[in-house]
Amino acid sequence: MKGLTLSTLSLLVCAGLSAQPNYDYSTIQREKLGRGVVCIRDNDSVTISWRYLSTDKANTAFNIYSNGKRLNPSPLVSSTFFRYPAKDKTTKYSVVPVIDGKETKEGKADYTLFKESSKPYISIPLNRPADVQIDSRMCQYSANDASVGDVDGDGEYEIILKWDCMGHDNSHEGVTGNVLIDCYKLNGKQLWRIDLGRNIRAGAHYTQFMVFDFDGDGKAELMMKTADGTKDGKGNYIGDKDANYVTNGYINKSIDGKMEPHKRYVSGRILSGAEYLTVFDGETGKALKTVDYIPSRGNIAAWGDNYGNRVDRFLACVAYLDGKHPSAVFCRGYYTRTVIAAWDWDGKELTSRWVFDSEKTDSINRITNPNALPYSGQGNHNLRVGDVDGDGCDEITYGSMAINNDGTGLYTIGMGHGDALHLMAFYPDSTSLQLWDVHENKRDGSDFRDARTGRIIFQIKSDIDVGRGMAADIDPTNPGLEMWSSSQRGYFDVNGNHHNTSTFIPQNSAVWWDGDKLRELLDRETITKFNWNTSRCEILKNFRDEGCAFNNSSKMNPCLSADIIGDWREEVIVRTRDSKELRVYTTTIPTPYRFHSFMEDIPYKISVATENVGYNQPPEPGFYFGITNNE
C-alpha cells in the first residue's frame, strides 16, 4: 500500500475497507474539488449536503449558517448532511470547516437557495435543438448520455450532454440527425455547443466522449472522434465542411468473409471518408488539436462484415498508464479484430503512446503456442479501468481480455463478447480486484474472476445470451458483494452460493442513495432497494411519475449517475420526457456516515468518465465499499 496518503487511507479505514490499487497519491495528477455544497427544499425543510474532502483533516467538523446565523448547536462531526426547517424565501447558506474548535475560512463555501427553487432537484433548462427533417419526416432531438468535468477550474463540475436524433444501432440502416454536444453549468448557463456533423452517425456505439483534465491545467478537456464537417464550439469547422460520406443504396453483403446470397441496404452508414480524433477546450468548446483516428477503417470487411456494423463499434476510456498522468484511450472493434490506441495531451500536442492490435498479438502468440486463446473477439459493449496488478498504473479490462499499461496483452480467457462488466473489490478483506462478466455466446454464461490473472473463481454457464449483469452489496447477511444476471432469478454471493428470489432483480445499474452502505438499484426510471427479508425490491424513487425518462431503449440508463455534489452519495441526472429540462436529483435521506467524495478515488472517477460508453455501466470504486462482518 505504499504511496497512499493518510487522508486516502482514512477513507478506506473509516468505511471498513482495504486498499487495492497501488496508486501513489502523492504524485498522481488529480483534480482539485471544491466543497460541493447543495441545498434542496424538501417539503417544509431544507436539506444541506457537502463534500468531505481528502484535504480535510480527520478531525474537521462543520458549522452551518443561514444568512449569517448559525443553525447547528454544536459542530457537525458524524456526517456532511444537515436538515433544517425553513420557509420558501431566498437564503444564503454557508458551510464553514471547524478545526480544533476554531472556524477556518479555508474550505468555506456558500450556496444561495432562491425562493423560486421550490422543487427537490436542480433544474437546468435545456436548449433543445430544432426538429430536423430526415427522409421526409420531422424528427426531434432527445437529450442522451452525459458526463461531468470541471471545465472552468472553479472546483465544481459542469455537465457535458450529448444530443441524439433518430439514433440507430450499428446493425440497423437509416439516416440520423447530427450528433450535438452541449456544456451546461449547474446554474443553467450553456457554455457552448459542438456539432459533430453529418459524417458522424448517431447511436450508442459511435460517439464515446471523454471529459477529463488531461494536461493538468486544472480545467477539463473533451476528447472524441470527429470527421469532416464537425463544427466546434466557436463555429470553426474541422476538415472539409462540405464533405458528405453518408451512404445510400445496396451492397453485396458479407459476414466473416462469406458472401451472402442477398444484398444489404446500407443507407445512412458512413463507410468512407476521413476520421479524426479531436481534443476540445472544455470551457469554450474550441477545437485545440485534431489528428487522424487510429485505427482507420482500412478494409471494412476485415472487421467481420462489409456493411458497417462491426467496423464502427467504438469504445473509449481514461487510464493512468504511467501512474501519474491520465491518458485518453480510443478503441475500435470487439467482435473480431480489436485495436486500442492510447493518447497523451500536454496542452499543445496530442501524441500516440501505444497501439494494441489483437490480430498482431494473436499472430505472435500462436508462433510459440498454436492453441493460445485469442485476444480478438473478446470485447464487450463496455470496458473497465483500474490498477489490477498493483504496479501503480492502470490496466484496461476489455471484456474477456485485459491490456497491460504498456499496451501489451495481460491475459485473455477466450469467452468472447458480452454486455456488462463490473470491476471492484468484492470481498471485505480483499487486497485485489475482481470482475463479474456476462457473455453472449449461449455457452459461457457469467464468470467471476481475478482481475489480475483472469483466473476463474466460479462460473455460471448458460445456454442463452446473458444480456445483462450487475454486482453490488445488496444483502448484509452475506459477506462481500452480490452478483446476478438476466439468465436466472436470484443472486450469487462471493462463494458462488445461489440465493433464489421470486422475481428478477434489476440488472442495469446501481446507485448509493439512502443512508446505509448497501447499494440501491437504478433501472427503468426507478430507484429500488432490495429487501433481503422478503427477497423483493421496493421502490424508493420513481422518476417516471415526475415526468422524466431514461435513455437508450432496453439499456434504460439516466443521462448520468455519479457523486458530483454534496456528500458521498450519488446524484442521478435525468431528462424530462420532452428534453426541455435536465434535472439533477440528489438524495434528501439522512445518513450517519461521513466518507470522502467518491470522485477522489481514481477508479471511480475514471468509471464516471467512461459511463457514457456503449452500454452504460454504473461507476464503481477501486476498493471494497459495503457492509462488513463487524456491523
Q: Could you say what each language-model-derived stretch is?
A:
Residues L53-N67:
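Solvent-exposed loop/turn segments flanking beta-strands in beta-repeat/beta-sandwich domains
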Residues I40-D44, D322:
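Short, ordered beta-strand-loop transition motifs
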Residues M1-N22:
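Bacterial Sec-dependent N-terminal signal peptides
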Residues Y23-Q29, N43:
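Surface-exposed loop/turn and intrinsically disordered segments
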Residues T27-G34, Y52-K57, P75-E631:
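Beta-propeller-forming repeat regions
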Residues R35, D44-I48:
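Structural beta-strand segments of beta-rich domains
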Residues C39, I48-S49, V95:
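Long terminal accessory regions outside catalytic cores
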